[in-house]
Amino acid sequence: MNLDALKLEICCAARFLYRAGMSAANAGHISVTIAEDRMLVNRFGPSFATMHPADILTVDYNGRVLEHDPSVSPYVNDTINLHAVIHRYNPQIAAVLHTHPPAAVTWSTFHKVPEIYDQESCIIAGDIAIVEDEFEGIASSEDRVRPFAEALGKKPLVLLPNHGAITTGRDVRTAMVRMILLEGACARNISVAAAARATGMTPHAISQDHALTAKQELAKIPFLEPLWEDFLKRLRQSDPDLFTTKVAATA
């Protein structure tokens, strides 16, 4: 995939997450590695709702902007540096997505990995980690980010208590779908907890063994590409401005 197509894919993922109610203000970044020491990442400023390919910067792993559209301000904030550290520590990770989905943020306050209650959540069974014992403010230094990077070297999804979530993948669309699945799992945990409290009934989670077995079975279904195509069809209806640029021809 060429750089223009990668930039558009980042924007499509961001726009869809916004449409799905999974972004907060202009917080959140999506990055994808393009060389040994550089990545594409959205600049700070525009929200996921309005992101365009011109908002995507080429940044090295020290946070230096190497290329940017001359029409935009190439401001690099602490969160972009967070992505750089994660990529530097984990060269095997292609894409990194960080945002603040409401259910994931809510569930993260319990400092607990969500239970698996449904078939879809089995796809991410055993893939979720919790980082930090408590919220310690913005992760603005490499010492603070290192635990995130180390956790993501072992698990592709991480909950940041009282903050948000980070998902990774072999490409942007995989990281995005994992974020959607994580948000769904957290939402169901919240709903199940509320139902249990209201009814006095005891919920039953899917056992770890059964969840992992279902995960293996679901992995045989090639759902990602048709799902991504469905997302694009929806975006062409809801966000036609994103597909009027020259890079849209590569989507």
Model-identified regions with their sequence ranges:
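Glycine-rich flexible loops
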Residues: 1-251
